[in-house]
Amino acid sequence: MSHYEAPIRVPLIKGHKTYRDITEDIARPIEERAGKLWWISLYASLVLFIYGFGCIAYTIGTGIGAWGLNRTVNWGWDITNFVWWVGIGHAGTLISAVLLLFRQKWRMAINRSAEAMTIFSVVQAGLFPIIHMGRPWLAYWTMPIPNQFGSLWVNFNSPLLWDVFAISTYLSVSLVFWWTGLLPDFAMLRDRAVKPFQKKIYSLLSFGWSGRAKDWQRFEEVSLVLAGLATPLVL
């Protein structure tokens, strides 16, 4: 008489789906035409973008005093939003990187959203120090790059320079971490692409991914290293 043996781990994907079913589920949002809800969300985001761009133009034209920087008893609009967006980015990194280090497989359901949220948040956070300068077209002056202006050089005691190094480092690690996780999906879209232009683009994005055991071994090693680098950045 046979006895019941409980599985060692609960399956991550329920419904008895095959690899083909999983591939179809992943590729469907990209290969199918966008729905009505997507277009509504796009137009709503475009309206908010135009409004935000107008506010930034007003700030640059009027002066950053419009952000309340003349009030010494509270924080100005720029540092408040900068810290808020950095906090959102840290949350995304902790969700994805820390769960990977602790081998929590269920992170696969939310890691893409968390990593994309991190990149978007860091980019948004980087805008506020640039706008805070009052002359955003001179933002490159905060970078230690050779120039022909004589004595023009960065001030390593300035918090603006600290922001440049912090944001650029955090964005670089987060971007590579996000891109590494997308390599198998880019390769899948490359193999399914019909148009030569799409196949070429996905081939470049997938970095020659073939799905061999060696690729997966390096994929896991690099992911662990990047997660180990990203986690101290938010602590």
Protein language model features and the residues they cover:
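Perimembrane topogenic segments of multi-pass inner/organellar membrane proteins
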Residues: 1-29, 132, 144-167, 173-177
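Juxtamembrane/interface segments at transmembrane-helix termini
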Residues: 56-67, 71, 99-111, 133-142, ...
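Membrane-embedded alpha-helical core segments of multi-pass
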Residues: 118-122, 135-138, 169-180
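Long, contiguous internal "core" modules enriched in hydrophobic/ aromatic residues
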Residues: 29-32, 36-56, 151, 156-235
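Membrane-interface interhelical loops and short amphipathic "cap" helices
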Residues: 55-80, 134-160, 213-219, 235
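Cytoplasmic juxtamembrane interface segments
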Residues: 12-25, 92-114, 194-213
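Membrane helical hairpin/interfacial module
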Residues: 72-137
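N-terminal signal-anchor module of multipass membrane proteins
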Residues: 2-91
